[in-house]
Amino acid sequence: MEKDLFMKVKCFVNQRDFSCNVFVCSDDKGAFIVDLGYYDSEIKKYLSSLPELKFVLQTHGHFDHIMGLDSFSKDFPDVPVYIHEQEVDVALNPTNNGSMGMLYSPVSLQITFKTLKEGMCRLCDYDFKVIHTPGHTKGSCMFFFKDQKILFTGDTIIETSIGRTDLPTGDEAALFRSLEKFKKISFDDDVEVCFGHGTSFSYKELMKHNSFLR
């Protein structure tokens, strides 16, 4: 019997603060989240309609991508949250996560992260590749679900542009090295590319319209 590789990706956008995308992915095996930048009753209600929620993946630790984690963890205390091993101190430090001076109340998370490294990863029957792309932050990552043809880029690549490097742990030279690394990876044209901000589109469209990747 052929394995069902269909995965539904629903995007919630934080319209109040910095328009960060929250991706809720689900299939017949369960569900997971990529970048919990906010958490409200709408997201909670949607999660309750899905199969078992397995885990949360964080592409990086900037405040606009992590602001929902503490509230979420109170409702789902047993759901682990994963982030690159070099990004833990970015997420947990209000200066490094960019919230100090940017928000009225700095983001000081009380959760405990589980860590990821570069390479293939298997979590709860989901196989994906962790692509370490430092530059926007030192532990920024992309997550590529090859079988489902979905790529999450975080803020390393955003539609027709790339992430900023003027925040703590940002490194312009490292970002451009990460872009060169990305260009050497083979993706099918119909892979859906999901950015940390903005509208998702295909890998073919990304390579056509993003001049930083030529």
Where does each model-flagged region fall?
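Metallo-beta-lactamase
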Residues: 127-213
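Short catalytic-loop micro-motif centered on adjacent basic/acidic residues
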Residues: 31-34, 55-57, 130-132
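Short Pro/Gly-enriched beta-strand edge/turn motifs at strand-loop
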Residues: 3-9, 101-102, 124-126
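Conserved beta-strand hairpin/beta-sheet module of binuclear metal-dependent hydrolase folds
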Residues: 2-46, 142-154, 158
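Active-site HxH/HxHxD metal-binding segment of metal-dependent hydrolases
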Residues: 38-122, 212
